[in-house]
């Protein structure tokens, strides 16, 4: 494993700035269940690891009766199936989160990571597609929303 820098931005703007600066040489860390394996195997060559777990909006679950449920990209799966609003209104999301790896993996893995990794074995993706889940994607030019199905095909 080669030496890499580590950055832990505390705002979404800072995280986006790092990702823009380093491009393909940045590794995005939410839970790390896939990224760390790739780094150890030298299958992903990164100059910097951008750890997004300290970005508040990426690490929270929000529910509003009008706008629905928002789950940040770095929320660990175990927090999803322990949330009372998710249990009450979105049990299918719990099903999707609970099939990602075993108990230890679920303490770190996230739906965002499962989706962004784009692995054929991404356990939660079929359920998210069936439920019509959308991704809110942040970039240097603002936000956009994309259905999970389109995100997976991009």
Language model regions located:
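C-terminal structural segment of proteins
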Residues: 1-154
């Amino acid at each position: 494993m080669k030496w890499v820098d580590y950055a832990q931005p505390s705002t979404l703007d800072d995280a986006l700035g790092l990702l823009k600066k380093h491009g393909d040489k940045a590794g995005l860390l939410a839970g790390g269940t896939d990224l760390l394996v790739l780094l150890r195997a030298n299958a992903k060559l990164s100059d910097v690891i951008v750890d997004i777990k300290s970005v508040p909006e990426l690490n929270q679950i929000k529910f509003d009766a009008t706008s629905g449920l928002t789950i940040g990209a770095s929320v660990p799966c175990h927090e999803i199936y322990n949330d009372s609003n998710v249990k009450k209104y979105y049990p299918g999301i719990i099903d999707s989160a609970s099939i990602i790896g075993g108990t230890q993996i679920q303490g770190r893995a996230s739906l965002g990571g499962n989706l962004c990794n784009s692995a054929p074995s991404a356990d939660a993706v079929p359920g998210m597609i069936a439920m019509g889940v959308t991704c809110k994607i942040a970039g240097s030019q603002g936000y956009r929303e994309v259905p999970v199905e389109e995100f997976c095909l991009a």
